[in-house]
Amino acid sequence: FEDIVITAHRALLRAGENVLAIHGLNRAPGDDDFLITAELTGEGILDLAPRYFQSPTPGEANEADGFAGFVADTSFSVDRGFYSEPFEVEIRSETEGAVIRYTFDGSEPGPAAGSIYDGPLLIQGTTTLRAMAFLEGMVPTNIDTHTYIFPDDIVVQDAAATIARGFPRNWGGTSADYGMDPDVIGQGGRDRFGGRYAETIRDDLLAIPTISVVMNIDEMFGSRGIYTNSGSRGRAWERRSSIEL
């Protein structure tokens, strides 16, 4: 049997009676075997409510499951930026009944990943807050990312603490270089400049543009990471990330 899709010719159908004509041929003039039968299979729209589908199927039946709509995007009560005092952040979605999940470690929240939001979140230091909202039967939101930077944390960060949080010791064949340079802003004026820049470093950080890049550590600094292989080019080296200015 052979299935022939005639959807492309549906415009030829007319209201009322239509005739299906079939031309059948034997395989050879002397072939006594001949069988031909036709069956028409059509699908109608039973549910007139509009639905949204993840994959397009032009000219063919839609997927079995669809979405009734989109979950309203998440909003944060405090915007990303520089801060010096602790504060609380509220996350909302205008979609009634939506569940919000969030993370503090830079990982992506998902239907089964991250913590369920149930009230204001306390931010006491440099934090990357990511959130996503879900509701069954609807398209979830994208991931929103807000990075809150406390300069007091930045000026004292060092290599040991960074490595302890899971960052690699080496970038390929090069030793990793994390943290602030103690030769420039050593504590108590113990640096090459007698504390000159240590006194102004907090204001200096606020005076220049800052970019926050949030992504998987291995995809940034691992053996196939884009920082480790900074000379590589092309789509094969693109990585999923969130960037904030």
Give the label of every model feature segment.
Residues 13-14, 21-44:
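Disulfide-stabilized, aromatic/cysteine-rich ligand-recognition loop
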Residues 7-11, 118-120:
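Beta-strand-rich interaction surfaces with strong enrichment in secreted/lumenal proteins
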